[in-house]
Each structure stands twice: as C-alpha cells, then as structure tokens.
Amino acid sequence: MAARPQQPPMEMPDLSNAIVAQDEMGRPFIIVKDQGNKKRQHGLEAKKSHILAARSVASIIKTSLGPRGLDKILISPDGEITITNDGATILSQMELDNEIAKLLVQLSKSQDDEIGDGTTGVVVLASALLDQALELIQKGIHPIKIANGFDEAAKLAISKLEETCDDISASNDELFRDFLLRAAKTSLGSKIVSKDHDRFAEMAVEAVINVMDKDRKDVDFDLIKMQGRVGGSISDSKLINGVILDKDFSHPQMPKCVLPKEGSDGVKLAILTCPFEPPKPKTKHKLDISSVEEYQKLQTYEQDKFKEMIDDVKKAGADVVICQWGFDDEANHLLLQNDLPAVRWVGGQELEHIAISTNGRIVPRFQDLSKDKLGTCSRIYEQEFGTTKDRMLIIEQSKETKTVTCFVRGSNKMIVDEAERALHDSLCVVRNLVKDSRVVYGGGAAEVTMSLAVSEEADKQRGIDQYAFRGFAQALDTIPMTLAENSGLDPIGTLSTLKSKQLKEKISNIGVDCLGYGSNDMKELFVVDPFIGKKQQILLATQLCRMILKIDNVIISGKDEY
C-alpha cells in the first residue's frame, strides 16, 4: 500500500486584527474586524468620484467669479455668520468630508498664501481640467498620458503669457503709482467695497509704498496692520501712518492729545516692558508688618521708588509712557501729577509695532532708559466713537513711517470682515506688482490668448498629446465663459466673439466686458492681473490635476463597532 503524500503544514491565519467571541452555547468563534466596514473604490469609478467631488466644489464658488460675482452666506456650527465672495474664505469655512474636495480647499489656500488673489479662479480652472480629463479617460486614453499632455500644454500657455504680458514699471514714480492704483481697483471690482474702490485702492497703494523695501522690491505684511471697528460706513475707512491701540490713557484727567513741546522734533515715547511697581524679591517671601510706623515706612519706600522711576523717565526726556504691564492707582496718580500721560497693558506685538513706527527701543529696565532709546512721533491722540465709551489711541507719524494701520469701518461685523478681506487682496495685488511689474489683461483675455496658442499647437501634435492639448485649451475657455455667464451674457457667443477678435486683430487684450463699458479692450479699461498670479494659477491647477489623475484606488477603513 502506497504511503499517503505528506501534506504541508497549514499556515496560521493572521489573528492580529481579530477578536474571539462565544455563542450562547459557549462555543468560541473568531470575528475579523474592519472587513465589513471597509470600502474600496478603484479604476474609472474612483476617478469619476474624484472629479464629481471637484465639480461640486467648483460649482459652489463658480458664481463668485468676476466683478458681477455673487456673495455667499456661510453659517458656522456655533451660529456665526460670514458673508463673502472670496474663494479661499468660502472653501475654508465649508464642512467637507470628501478627500478630493479638501485638496481643492488646500489648493485655494496655497494660492491665497502665495499670491493673495485669484483663489476662485484657480479652483474653477482645476475643476475644468479634471472634467476634460474625465472625457479623455472615457475615450480610453491613459491618465498619465493626459497628465503629461497637460503639463506640456501648461508650459506652452505660460510661455505665451510671458510673450504677451506688459511691463508697467516706469522711471517716473508718479506714473508707476497710477498703474498700481488702477490695478488695485481691478482687484476690488467684485468686492463689497466696490462702490468705494477709489478710497480702498488709495489705502492699499499708500500702505505698500510706505513700508516697501525699494532695494529688495519686497513688502513685509507684518508692518501693515489691519484694524476693524463696527460703526460708521465703509467710506469712513482710512489709512493711519502709525499705530492704533485699542486702549486709552490710564487716567481720565490725562490730556486727550499730546503734541510736541516747543523746540522738539516730535512727541517722545518711553516704551517699557518693566512694571511700574516697587522691586520684589525673586524667591517666595513673607512680609510681617506689626505697627503703623512700619506700614508708613513701607508706603514711603514705595512712593520713593515710584518717584525714582518717574525721575528716570523724565530725565530721559519722555513725554508719554507706553507700558506692557499695569500699575496701581498710586503710580497712576503720580504720573498725572508729573504731567506724564501713560498707557498700560499694551501687548507685546503692539509694542514692537510702536517701536518700529517711532524708531524707538523697547526698554526692559528703568535704569537703561536714555534719550537715544526714546521713540518719536508727530502726535498721540485719543479718539472716541459715537455715543459709546469706546476709545482708541492713535500714534501718528507725519514723516516717513515704517508701519501703517488700515482702519476699516462698517455698519456691522460681517461688512467690516469682508472689507478687510477685500483690502488684503488689494494689498497682495499691489505687493505682487512691486515684486514683478509685469501684468496680463483680465476679463478672461489672458485665458483666451493661452487657449488659442494651445489649440494651435494641438493641431501640430501627431500623437495622443493632441487630445490633452485640446482638453487643456477647453479648460482655459471655462474662465471667460464663467465671467460672461456671471455678467448675464451668452457664454458661448461671447467666447467665440473674443476668439475671432483676438485672431483677427492679433492682440491679446480683448476680454469680456463684464461691467458693460461698451469696449472689450482690457488695456484701454486697464483691467489687469499680476503676471505672477496668473502663472501661479496655471501651475497649481495643473499640479493638482496630475496628482488626482494618478489616484486609482481609494480604500476607506471603517470604524470598529465593538
């Protein structure tokens, strides 16, 4: 009888993700966790799911594009209301579960962080690219070939953009300032402040010119402070050459306005981080006072110390004391007696702004205070608002200042917040033009120019790349079509008119006449976008599209319900 062949030993299953349970008879059985709840999408189904998610996000903010774009009202879980048409703000405040939708939010944030404007356009363009990619995938073209084709088309589009852009830098500073002013107005066209865009554009340009580093051609936004206050109207907003403190003088009898003394070049400020109080032991201590004499001796000691501190300040020549810490009523009274107006409980960041603005030094000890460490400003005054008891201190500079404050007013908090966001976008546009003075023309003119160049190149391509090039060109057409649609125009008719005009007249500044000026010449209307902003839009949208096209599997692990 032949021997039975020996069976290989059975491998033990992986029980690391399992639990042992017993039935009602006490018999053991094994439950493998996660298997029932785990979901998986792959292949075309996964890509469709991603692109539909991107399309749904883009459809929400699409109607906010352009000067005729509409606003959105966003209500947070705790009931806070935000009204805005800023793409980055809309997306950041939306509750999104889908992973691809979250990538679009990050895309918008990246554009906002890097450029500050064009956050809506970059999401609309990325969604349009993904829509075109889906059509090509359904025709049987491999996603990587589509992504490679899009990359090549993006390079061509950017090179065309570089050919057709204009440089607005001028040897005359006044002319360059005028260009910056008109560019700032373009960015404010779609915002809530569009009726006062002259005032806000002026604020943005003045702020950037005051603080910019002319040698490096850069602007430090930390030197431009934004301060909003509910009350008044948007037209009451103004630029302060200096710093605004949400404080008032420490004593109600102190003067409401401090002006330079005769023969002085300005009001002298002592900026202190040391408290106005007698010195204390560093270690834990206990002070026993057993008689009235001892208490009076202690009180006299405290008064002497306060007088020493005030003498140090006056000896240095200070007119006003700005202190990071508080001081008690006795110190406050002595400051009033010695004609030294003071401000207490000023934050560390505000102290830095004051020091930069007044060219002073922050002093940690009274003994270190000297004349050369004092800050100088043209005046300090207290401003009241309406019938409320709200007060603000304004430290103002009449000479060239290193810090500015944009003081924004509005009838309610939502308007103030949206006005601040609009002003931030405008500041970013001006900053970008200071860094790189090249501009492309708005109203979809740049996109139409790039679309025509990419379509022309598509006809020269022999392989599958031609489909990707045409898809990229059609995605670029989405921007002018959306602008036309949001302006109440016929999208397809408007696009075909723009393309025929650009081809016929061989100029790249023909765009959508969103505001009904009767002219499509964006150069004449001076509707411009910074070149670096438009270039960044193309690059970021193409990179995101490539990343999403490379995903073919989505595995969602379920939650344990045991």
Curated annotation (Swiss-Prot):
Pfam families: Cpn60_TCP1 (PF00118). This is T-complex protein 1 subunit epsilon. One of its GO terms (cellular component) is chaperonin-containing T-complex. It is found in: Cytoplasm. The gene is CCT5. Heterooligomeric complex of about 850 to 900 kDa that forms two stacked rings, 12 to 16 nm in diameter. Belongs to the TCP-1 chaperonin family. NCBIfam families: chap_CCT_epsi, thermosome_alpha, thermosome_beta. GO terms for biological process: chaperone mediated protein folding independent of cofactor; protein folding. Its main location: cytoplasm. GO terms for molecular function: ATP binding; ATP hydrolysis activity; ATP-dependent protein folding chaperone; unfolded protein binding. Molecular chaperone; assists the folding of proteins upon ATP hydrolysis. Known to play a role, in vitro, in the folding of actin and tubulin. In yeast may play a role in mitotic spindle formation. It comes from Saccharomyces cerevisiae (strain ATCC 204508 / S288c) (Baker's yeast). Keywords: ATP-binding, Chaperone, Cytoplasm, Nucleotide-binding. It comes from the Eukaryota.
